[in-house]
Amino acid sequence: MLTIDAVGTPVFSDAIDIANARIRFANGCVVNATASRVSLRMERKMRIFEDDAYLSLDLQQKILTLIRKREGSGTPGQLPVQIEEQRLEQGDALKAEIEAFLECIRTGRPPTVSGEDGLAALETAMRITEQVNESLAARRLTEAGLDV
C-alpha cells in the first residue's frame, strides 16, 4: 500500500455520519470506499474498473453487472458495450467463513486469506479510522477558531 487519505464528518449527530477513504496501492490500484449513515437508500456496492470492462457488484441485491467493451463501432450514439447481469447465490457469509476455517483445520490446507493478510487488512482499517478521527478533530479546532 502506498497512501491512505481518509476523512469523516458528522452530519446529523455528534458522531461521524459519513466517511470516505482513498487507498492507493504500489501497483497503481486505487480504492475509494465510503461509509454513510445519511444516505437516502441502503446500499452495499463494489465497483471494479478494468481497461475494457466495468463490474458493479450489488451486495445488497446480490446482482453482478458486467459491462464489457465490444469490438466494432456499434450503433451511432450508443457505446459499443455488452451488458451481462447475473444473480448471485444467496448465502451466509459468516457460516461460509467458519466452514472454510474448519476445513483448513481438518485438511491442513492453508486458508484463503492468510493471517498476515488479515493483519494487514486490520492495520489498514485502523489507519483509516485514525485519519477519520484526526480529520474530525481538525475540523472542530478550525470551527473553534484555532489553527490546526
Residue map of PLM features:
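Short polybasic amphipathic segments
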Residues: M46-I48, K62-P76
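C-terminal helix-rich "cap/oligomerization" subdomain common to oxidoreductases
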Residues: A26, A100-V148
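Short glycine/proline- and charge-enriched loop/turn segments
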Residues: P76-E84
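Short secondary-structure transition/capping segments
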Residues: I16-D17, K69, A125-M126
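Contiguous beta-strand/loop segments that form the cofactor/metal-binding neighborhood of enzyme cores
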Residues: M1-K62, G91, K95-R109, A144-V148
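A short glycine-threonine-serine/GTX helix/turn-capping micro-motif
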Residues: I83-D92
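Short active-site-adjacent structural elements
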Residues: L57, L66, A121-L122
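Residue-level detector of alpha-helical recognition elements and their boundaries
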Residues: A19, E43, I63, R70, ...
